[in-house]
Curated annotation (Swiss-Prot):
Signal peptide: none
GO aspect biological process, one term: regulation of DNA repair
Chain's gene name: recX
Name of this chain's protein: Regulatory protein RecX
Protein task: Modulates RecA activity.
Lineage of the organism: Bacteria, Pseudomonadati, Pseudomonadota, Alphaproteobacteria, Hyphomicrobiales
InterPro entries: RecX_HTH_2nd, Regulatory_RecX, WH-like_DNA-bd_sf
Localization annotation: Cytoplasm
NCBIfam families to which the protein is assigned, alphabetical: PRK00117.4-4
Pfam families: RecX_HTH2
Family (UniProt): Belongs to the RecX family.
Predominant localisation class: cytoplasm
Protein's organism: Agrobacterium fabrum (strain C58 / ATCC 33970) (Agrobacterium tumefaciens (strain C58))
Length: 184
């Protein structure tokens, strides 16, 4: 492909590679990322930073950054999935919601499934109810409108109707027993 008589370069320059390495280091120091997130971020920023960069160079920079990150052991999708799942469970996120989040972040289905095996939707639902003052943690007597609102909130957050009904029917003591027995 030619633009204005010049052939588009296929290989990234040493300046581009150095920038990709430094940018990957900076991003991974700021937060834990998946392989897909790092590749996409480097490719997006490379298009912004370098004016005459071609699609092949952009892709090569993304791959270089990912390879570099794996080389220094700063990128690990399995650890990312496990940490995300544990954090989500502690904050009351459903297994379904966590699976969707991992899929969006680009974690492989097998890795996400392995990380999600230890999760317990009942524990997460009780935590969610405690955060929102639903079910056993309700401060006022519910009317039908309030119950419908609470069931809707459970459903929107990925919990099944059965789990929502189970949590809504619990006493505070039963809910606290579930939380005390749960490994968080």
């Amino acid at each position: 492909m030619e633009f204005d008589g010049e052939a588009q370069a296929v290989e990234p320059t040493s300046r581009m590679l150095s920038w990709a390495r430094n940018s990957a280091l900076y991003r991974l120091q700021q937060r834990m990322m998946t392989e897909k997130q790092l590749r996409d971020a480097i490719m997006r920023k490379a298009r912004e930073k370098f004016e005459d960069i071609g699609p092949a160079q952009v892709k090569a920079l993304g791959e270089f950054a990912v390879t570099f990150a794996y080389g220094i052991k700063a990128l690990d999708d399995t650890a990312y999935a496990e940490i995300t799942v544990r954090s989500g469970q502690r904050s009351g996120k459903s297994k379904r919601g966590l699976a969707q989040k991992l899929q969006i972040k680009g974690v492989a289905r097998e890795t996400a499934t392995a990380a999600l095996q230890e999760t317990n939707d009942l524990v997460a639902a009780v935590i969610f109810a405690r955060k929102r003052a639903f079910g056993p943690y309700r401060r006022v007597e519910p009317d039908e409108k309030r119950k419908a609102k609470e069931f809707s909130a459970f459903a929107r957050n990925g919990f099944s109707f059965e789990i929502g009904a189970k949590v809504m029917a619990m006493t505070t003591e039963e809910a606290e027993d579930i939380l005390s027995d749960a490994p968080l």
